[in-house]
């Protein structure tokens, strides 16, 4: 290890009696260019983030690579992945119930667990991309795995050997549990191909947005604008995939059967894979920086070993950093020292006893320590979005059950209940279409931010709108329930009430769509910009992890509510008969939890210190 370039200044006293507070305030003088916020090092590539080609060599002419053309190849891959993901989420519960003859509740729990594990395990994909494979090869490997899983699901739905006997299994027999159950090996096959698909999605999800953002030139004066528009277009591709899944795939399933429906997803993924690989010559790549988990572990171990060392010790030399412009981490710029989480600075505390070539488990660079600080600093923001994911998960089940009791006709056209979740997607599509022409000019006048609102402000707007959405859902469900009881539908919970339209649900759907587009797009952009250079994919995985935890949290909340509200007759807020249950009370509970979560977010966002600013204009926009 190269000797430290940063030495202890003469002006700093080394007497044990010095004030600890004084030394905390002065600690940053041991690192060059220190400040509470990081200056962006000229937004150039001198810090180790030089774009390279697929062979790992620097790109001589950036004009022939990257940009919007390369990004559109990536959009196609994400649209197909989301189409498959939502296509499975909306169809798999029904497939397990109607075809595999599994109980509805266990089918729903199995799919919720699949969705949760798929999203939560995105951290693994982000780790592999940042540590060893790079984002391109991670996407290439896992998108192929995704395709293999979809082909397996298609075969399982198409070949009779993989499903139980369907003869003499009408709807009444199905409800009474008299149909032939799926054999254990048939369920094992289904779960195997399903989780192959899930882990394929987990590898793609944290990498696609980061890889797309990598295609833009950090030295360009329009970089921030391009990045802002990229994440909006990226989420637009996500939305288009969801809309196709909730309409075309549902239609194919109803008209042509399960095999064709899942086959449609496999064909779409195959085409998107071909397009993704066709764009290979255009892509800009970033070199993986080595195992980020190892670097985090080294910082924690080194800080623990030196927990009793003092910054005023006579053995103290300075805070360690390698000389030169580049950091010791491949693909990462140096990160100046910050004054929070002082206890972690012990890992970079260079003592005389460390010698000329100390172990990385005893002495870490300032940049390495700051990486860990950033990861810790980021945690509260995506954590606050778990509540939004919980609400979205509840909507997928609760609002569909509401729709079964309502009139879904548009003139002479009857809309399938399973198509109802398309409306949040349509509202997202509309909001993204109007974002730059309507929202940005209006909010620019209010905030003075050239982009309309900062990333954290957009996350906050999304969380606030989600509170309004779930509050409205509670109001309407209370009205729907009383209407059903007063008009003799109390025990006919699968019968549509002809005079009460399902399109009252559009209000909560559209509001949650608005909440989603502001919160998730703002969060993705925030995590990409704030994550360390060599941990961009892990930063993006934070958002997916929050989504997965939201799925699990919804299951846990439902179980708690059932146990806490069950009466002597076995009825609870979540009774199978929606008209005798109290879904409205659950919506009120979600409203309260969402409000408390929003308060926590405001506190966390107010305390957050942005990692990088470039100008005074950006400084003012960084305040929530």
Swiss-Prot record:
Q: Could you tell me where this protein is found in the cell?
A: Membrane
Q: Per the UniProt entry, what are the Gene Ontology biological process annotations, in alphabetical order? A: oligopeptide transport
Q: What single Pfam family name could you report for this chain, choosing any that match?
A: PTR2
Which tissues does it occur in?
A: Expressed in flower and siliques.
Gene3D superfamilies in UniProt: MFS general substrate transporter like domains
Please give the superkingdom of this protein's source.
Eukaryota
Q: Where are the transmembrane segments?
A: 83-100, 114-134, 139-159, 184-204, 230-250, 258-278, 378-398, 422-442, 459-479, 504-524, 537-557, 585-605
Question: One Gene Ontology cellular component annotation?
Answer: membrane
Primary localisation category: membrane
Which keywords does this chain's UniProt record carry? Membrane, Phosphoprotein, Transmembrane, Transmembrane helix, Transport
Gene Ontology molecular functions: transmembrane transporter activity
Per the record, residues carrying Phosphothreonine are 138
Q: Where is this region: Disordered?
A: 1-20
Q: How does it sit in the membrane?
A: Multi-pass membrane protein
The similarity comment for this entry is:
Belongs to the major facilitator superfamily. Proton-dependent oligopeptide transporter (POT/PTR) (TC 2.A.17) family.
The protein in question is named Protein NRT1/ PTR FAMILY 6.1
Q: Which organism is it from?
A: Arabidopsis thaliana
Q: Which gene encodes it?
A: NPF6.1
């Amino acid at each position: 290890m190269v000797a430290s370039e940063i030495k202890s200044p003469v002006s700093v006293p080394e007497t044990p009696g010095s004030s600890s507070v004084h030394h905390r305030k002065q600690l940053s003088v041991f690192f060059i260019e220190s400040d509470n916020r990081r200056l962006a090092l000229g937004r150039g590539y001198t810090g180790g983030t030089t774009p390279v080609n697929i062979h790992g060599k620097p790109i001589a002419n950036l004009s022939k690579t990257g940009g919007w053309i390369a990004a559109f190849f990536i959009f196609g891959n994400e649209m197909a992945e989301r189409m498959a993901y939502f296509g499975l989420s909306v169809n798999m519960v029904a497939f397990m119930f109607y075809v595999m003859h599994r109980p509805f509740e266990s089918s729903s729990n199995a799919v919720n667990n699949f969705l949760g594990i798929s999203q939560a395990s995105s951290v693994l994909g982000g780790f592999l991309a940042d540590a060893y494979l790079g984002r391109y090869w991670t996407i290439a490997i896992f998108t192929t795995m995704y395709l293999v899983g979809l082909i397996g699901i298609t075969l399982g739905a198409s070949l009779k050997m993989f499903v139980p006997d369907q003869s003499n299994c009408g709807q009444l027999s199905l409800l009474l549990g008299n149909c032939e159950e799926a054999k254990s090996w048939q369920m094992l096959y289904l779960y195997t191909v399903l989780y192959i698909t899930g882990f394929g999605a987990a590898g793609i999800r944290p990498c696609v947005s980061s890889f797309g953002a990598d295609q833009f030139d950090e030295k360009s004066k329009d970089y921030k604008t391009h990045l802002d528009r990229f994440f909006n277009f990226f989420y637009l591709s996500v939305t288009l995939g969801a809309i196709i899944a909730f309409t075309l795939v549902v239609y194919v399933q109803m008209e042509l059967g399960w095999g064709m429906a899942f086959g449609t997803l496999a064909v779409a993924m195959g085409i998107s894979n071909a397009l993704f690989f066709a764009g290979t010559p255009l892509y800009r790549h970033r070199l993986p920086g080595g195992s980020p988990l190892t670097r985090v572990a080294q910082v924690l171990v080194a800080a623990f070993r030196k927990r009793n060392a003092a910054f005023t010790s006579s053995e103290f030399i300075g805070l360690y950093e390698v000389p030169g412009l580049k950091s010791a981490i491949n693909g990462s710029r140096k990160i100046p020292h910050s004054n929070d989480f002082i206890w972690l600075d012990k890992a970079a505390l260079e003592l005389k006893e460390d010698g000329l070539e100390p172990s990385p488990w005893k002495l870490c660079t300032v940049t390495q320590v700051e990486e860990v600080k950033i990861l810790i600093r980021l945690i509260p923001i995506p954590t606050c979005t778990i509540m939004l994911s919980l609400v979205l998960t509840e909507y997928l089940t609760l609002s569909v059950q509401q729709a079964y009791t309502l009139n879904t006709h548009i003139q002479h056209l009857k809309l399938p209940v399973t198509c109802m979740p398309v409306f949040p997607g349509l509202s997202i599509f509309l909001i993204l279409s109007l974002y730059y022409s309507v929202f940005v000019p209006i909010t620019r006048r209010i905030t003075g931010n050239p982009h309309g609102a900062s990333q954290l402000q957009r996350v906050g707007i999304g969380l606030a709108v989600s509170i309004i959405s779930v509050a409205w859902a509670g109001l309407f469900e209370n009205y729907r329930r009383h209407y059903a009881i007063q008009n003799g539908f109390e025990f006919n919970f699968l019968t549509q009430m002809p005079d009460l339209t399902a399109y009252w649900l559009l209000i909560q759907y559209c509001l949650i769509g608005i909440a989603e587009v502001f919160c998730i797009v703002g969060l993705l952009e925030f995590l990409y910009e704030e994550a360390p250079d060599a941990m961009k994919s892990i930063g993006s995985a934070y958002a997916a992890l929050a989504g997965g935890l939201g799925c699990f949290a919804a299951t846990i909340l439902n179980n708690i509510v059932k146990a806490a509200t069950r009466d002597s007759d076995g009825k609870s807020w979540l009774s199978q008969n929606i008209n005798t249950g109290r879904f409205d009370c659950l919506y009120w509970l979600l409203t309260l939890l969402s409000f408390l979560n929003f308060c926590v977010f405001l506190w966390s966002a107010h305390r957050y210190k942005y990692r990088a600013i470039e100008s005074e204009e950006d400084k003012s926009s960084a305040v929530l």
